């Protein structure tokens, strides 16, 4: 699909901001490699009624000048996003130098319908998300890049490339929400807090009370037929309607379970089982379920301040044999998921922070495979708490929000419906030879 870059602007904060180095926590640094950005897209379809898309300050649909001016103002309180990475000894820091965030304006000759259901893939990422040149070193590239793309149908997309060392998805949403509010002439909803050293530094001396297997590298054990480099991976979307989710829950035997199982726990367990079956693994093989968890509500001694703008993502891990996943009831599997999630309390998370300090140079735990696979494991990331409907810049709420590209086999995202109808979308990357079998097992209940 064709894409033409019309203009690129380095947007700097509208006012003077603190010129300092920002200490990064171990949790900031361990979630991704420093030479990477996370891509996501918002889709806005132009309403049929022109009166529905009139911004109070502009008659143009998604006026780039308004977005750039608002972005410049949003970067004042969120000033680390306008900085650059640097190395201080053996640690990365953010140099808050106000060099700016990149804003790209682009046009495509295609219509939004050409992308179908907006399933993540290389082409969608290429067209809608700005690219980054990492070749000039760690301090050369922006930590935030945004692309406004106009399509022939009149619709637009806003693609984000956000650096995970700066913040996690929830904090990035707060930035986007503030940017959108400013574009409408409103004040930001909250004041961001950037001090990670005060709130998430390790204890001295460390108090490591648990084994923290989630930080062990997940080394892939690919079978020979997947090692030839010729086996493709495929990314696709699977939708579970509210009725299907209810049917799945009705399969549960809750007679001996005194705690209610959440929708995420049930669906994550179902995905775990379905992937293990689709891969055709032997019954004795172990398969891990990896679940990124927002720790904001779990850290309480002391609690994090509202508006904390860093990474608070921790990993919960379940382990089971393929035979157990296949033979045991879904209730048992979902119970294991619930137990793993409940274990991430304040005591455990503080211990995890101390553990990372005791292991200098700890590798990114689940993103270190040159084959870009988690095989035989699976990662289920929930975006259910990101209220993307609030990202209204003055021309209406987005009709779609999702990940732009999933690079690793076994990695998936659960995203709730924007319509609030109780349905969920699963975006997943699997080896192509496993995908059709996964679909069969995923809908077989």
Swiss-Prot record:
The keyword Transferase is annotated on this UniProt entry: yes
Assigned protein family: Belongs to the plant acyltransferase family.
E.C. designation(s): 2.3.1.144
Keywords: Acyltransferase, Flavonoid biosynthesis, Transferase
Modification comment: N-terminus is blocked.
GO molecular function, one term: anthranilate N-benzoyltransferase activity
Biological role: Catalyzes the formation of N-benzoylanthranilate, in the course of methoxydianthramide B, a phytoalexin. Phytoalexins are produced in response to infection by parasites, and are essential for the expression of disease resistance.
Designated name of the protein: Anthranilate N-benzoyltransferase protein 1
GO biological process: one example: flavonoid biosynthetic process
Catalysed reactions, as listed in the record: anthranilate + benzoyl-CoA = N-benzoylanthranilate + CoA
Domain of life: Eukaryota
Pathway membership: Phytoalexin biosynthesis; methoxydianthramide B biosynthesis
Gene transcribed to yield this protein: HCBT1
Top-level enzyme category: transferase
pH dependence: Inactive below pH 7.0.
Catalytic residues identified in the record: 164 (proton acceptor), 392 (proton acceptor)
Up-regulation conditions: By fungal elicitors. Elicitation triggers a rapid, transient induction, reaching maximal abundances within about 0.5 hours and returning to basal levels within 4 hours.
